[in-house]
Amino acid sequence: MIDRVDNNHFDLVSDYQPTGDQPQAIQQLTAGIESGEKEQILLGATGTGKTFTISNVIAKVNKPTLILSHNKTLAGQLYGEFKKFFPNNAVEYFVSYYDYYQPEAYVPSSDTYIEKDSAINDEIDKLRHSATSSLLERNDVIVVASVSSIFGLGDPHEYQDHVVSLRVGMEIDRNDLLRKLVDIQFDRNDIDFQRGRFRVHGDVVEIFPASRDDHALRVEFFGDEIDRIREIDALTGEIVADREHVAIFPATHFMTNDAIMEHAIKGIEDELDGRLKELTADGKLLEAQRLKQRTTYDVEMLKEMGYTSGIENYSRFMDGRKPGEPPYTLLDFFPKDFLLVVDESHVTMPQVRGMYNGDRARKQMLVDYGFRLPSALDNRPLKLEEVEQHINQVVYMSATPGPYEMDRTKHVVQQIIRPTGLLDPTIEVRPIMGQIDDLVGEINKRIEVNERVFITTLTKKMAEDLTDYFKDLGIKVRYLHSDIKTLERTQIIRDLRLGKFDVLVGINLLREGIDVPEVSLVAILDADKEGFLRNERSLIQTIGRAARNEHGSVIMYADTTTDSMQAAMDETARRRAVQMKYNEDHHITPHTIKKAIPELIASTKTTEDAGKKDDFLETDFDDMTREQQLDMISKLEEQMKTAAKKLDFEQAATLRDTVMELKAQIS
């Protein structure tokens, strides 16, 4: 057990003071929280500094805070911003640690069973451990999370009970410490020293915490007493600091013990017996045989190894939960009086609601056809009503709050004025005929003045074709799509801001929270095609991407003006009028937001070759003379042709794209 520090305070560090309507928003939200208001809405137009406002609120109310975001890109962006605002506090990041995840599934129509397949990102796993350990150690914690936070995580009480606490002068046998480390899933490896491992040299035990990747701990014994504890650089072994006390958290969030495991196995075997009788009585002999074979194998693995592939399907027994009871999640690691902030709530809350149903439908097939026991259905995300039961106090943040939030509270705080005096962008509607040539002209105007462009399309095919077309014209362009891995999207947004390319094409990824002040033009293709991506809320969000630049403008390419288009244009005009009046009254001249480009979370290099091309562009090409650059392009073209001759078309295509980018870079 560890002693949690509850007297820390949030220390907001910023060169700016709240301006515009930020002060009244901060005051109203803070007063609402302090008076016990359970749910509030911050209706903040794009670029009005909602993150800064909520940071001020967090600092004033001093509660552990969960920031819930609807995707990893935005979560990564928010993580960087909050880390900058609170450098002296624990700002953590908690998203799914899978680079790739194929869930277990069964398709009856084709009798196809799909095994679970996944690739875990070690960096994100480290950050997840850092988040949970911080929540148990201190109160000044902000966790920026995706909806991964409502998925099963393991019992926080078991996790905390297994923490190994070490102090200088403490009497403990060295071998007892080693056994404790093994119990909390640490591996001994005296050669390959990594997270979640320890190594032993005589009376010295070095432990690499699961929540760190830079510093390890060196515990020095004198007999059966801890003589000294030192924090060391894991790579060089240099001493960083002396420590009087350390808490070693488990290397996994799913902790158990022999008694729990024994009880769980009994429960699994009892359920298997009952389920086999049901299936046999229903004449489902194949399903019964399949279930018996698979479950018996899992039970044998649990008995012998304490682990089996797919152990999460038995989590109900491991946690000691009753049928239907919700699983433990990140929310259970927070104290009861925590503050929840839902970013882009109009998207996040429907996503939270949909998680349970999608998971249930897939697992029900596995249960019905004898691949899993019915208890596997309890390895699931939380239902919306279960999330609501965890909520102590919540602030929903959005420029366009959804019906869920608006139905739950009338306490709406508006924030329309931007601190920089920036106005909502101007909007033009232009005909679809000749739209691409028109768009090329507009792009070139922006490139000449070092500004960026967002283009949003309706289909992946159109986005890809448009990207290829622009590349052929020598325009530096990238395509942001759903196949891009976890945090590589954040890298792309950062590269756009750095000017490594000028145009970003996307489908529905260029709406909420993508924060690029350098973007002065947003082009919306097929704006008159009513639907999810072109409704009023989506259009307002997309328009908002141009609201951080003093030259911000939006062009909608459409042959008719739909009701959604008109409503979005009317709301934008209303806000623009309010903003212009405020600027006139206070003699403010709008200026583009000057925002530092933050460093990336270290996990952006998620695969073996992720970012190789970008690394090449960054480290070598920019430093070459023009003659060297042309020579490099020539060599790459030769490699491209060689790859094509060998029928390695994937490599050839990668080299082709690189050559096109390099040619555009020097043109």
Curated annotation (Swiss-Prot):
<dbReference type="InterPro" id="IPR001943">
    <property type="entry name" value="UVR_dom"/>
</dbReference>
<dbReference type="GO" id="GO:0006289">
    <property type="term" value="P:nucleotide-excision repair"/>
</dbReference>
<feature type="domain" description="Helicase C-terminal">
    <location>
        <begin position="435"/>
        <end position="597"/>
    </location>
</feature>
<dbReference type="InterPro" id="IPR036876">
    <property type="entry name" value="UVR_dom_sf"/>
</dbReference>
<dbReference type="InterPro" id="IPR024759">
    <property type="entry name" value="UvrB_YAD/RRR_dom"/>
</dbReference>
<dbReference type="InterPro" id="IPR014001">
    <property type="entry name" value="Helicase_ATP-bd"/>
</dbReference>
<keyword id="KW-0963">Cytoplasm</keyword>
<dbReference type="InterPro" id="IPR041471">
    <property type="entry name" value="UvrB_inter"/>
</dbReference>
<dbReference type="InterPro" id="IPR001650">
    <property type="entry name" value="Helicase_C-like"/>
</dbReference>
<dbReference type="GO" id="GO:0016887">
    <property type="term" value="F:ATP hydrolysis activity"/>
</dbReference>
<comment type="subunit">
    <text>Forms a heterotetramer with UvrA during the search for lesions. Interacts with UvrC in an incision complex.</text>
</comment>
<dbReference type="GO" id="GO:0009380">
    <property type="term" value="C:excinuclease repair complex"/>
</dbReference>
<dbReference type="GO" id="GO:0005737">
    <property type="term" value="C:cytoplasm"/>
</dbReference>
<dbReference type="GO" id="GO:0003677">
    <property type="term" value="F:DNA binding"/>
</dbReference>
<comment type="similarity">
    <text>Belongs to the UvrB family.</text>
</comment>
<dbReference type="Pfam" id="PF02151">
    <property type="entry name" value="UVR"/>
</dbReference>
<feature type="domain" description="Helicase ATP-binding">
    <location>
        <begin position="31"/>
        <end position="414"/>
    </location>
</feature>
<dbReference type="InterPro" id="IPR027417">
    <property type="entry name" value="P-loop_NTPase"/>
</dbReference>
<dbReference type="InterPro" id="IPR004807">
    <property type="entry name" value="UvrB"/>
</dbReference>
<keyword id="KW-0267">Excision nuclease</keyword>
<dbReference type="GO" id="GO:0009381">
    <property type="term" value="F:excinuclease ABC activity"/>
</dbReference>
<feature type="domain" description="UVR">
    <location>
        <begin position="630"/>
        <end position="665"/>
    </location>
</feature>
<keyword id="KW-0234">DNA repair</keyword>
<dbReference type="Pfam" id="PF00271">
    <property type="entry name" value="Helicase_C"/>
</dbReference>
<feature type="short sequence motif" description="Beta-hairpin">
    <location>
        <begin position="97"/>
        <end position="120"/>
    </location>
</feature>
<dbReference type="Pfam" id="PF04851">
    <property type="entry name" value="ResIII"/>
</dbReference>
<comment type="function">
    <text>The UvrABC repair system catalyzes the recognition and processing of DNA lesions. A damage recognition complex composed of 2 UvrA and 2 UvrB subunits scans DNA for abnormalities. Upon binding of the UvrA(2)B(2) complex to a putative damaged site, the DNA wraps around one UvrB monomer. DNA wrap is dependent on ATP binding by UvrB and probably causes local melting of the DNA helix, facilitating insertion of UvrB beta-hairpin between the DNA strands. Then UvrB probes one DNA strand for the presence of a lesion.</text>
</comment>
<keyword id="KW-0228">DNA excision</keyword>
<keyword id="KW-0547">Nucleotide-binding</keyword>
<dbReference type="GO" id="GO:0009432">
    <property type="term" value="P:SOS response"/>
</dbReference>
<dbReference type="Pfam" id="PF12344">
    <property type="entry name" value="UvrB"/>
</dbReference>
<keyword id="KW-0067">ATP-binding</keyword>
<dbReference type="GO" id="GO:0005524">
    <property type="term" value="F:ATP binding"/>
</dbReference>
<protein>
    <recommendedName>
        <fullName>UvrABC system protein B</fullName>
    </recommendedName>
</protein>
<dbReference type="InterPro" id="IPR006935">
    <property type="entry name" value="Helicase/UvrB_N"/>
</dbReference>
<keyword id="KW-0227">DNA damage</keyword>
<feature type="binding site">
    <location>
        <begin position="44"/>
        <end position="51"/>
    </location>
    <ligand>
        <name>ATP</name>
    </ligand>
</feature>
<keyword id="KW-0742">SOS response</keyword>
<dbReference type="Pfam" id="PF17757">
    <property type="entry name" value="UvrB_inter"/>
</dbReference>
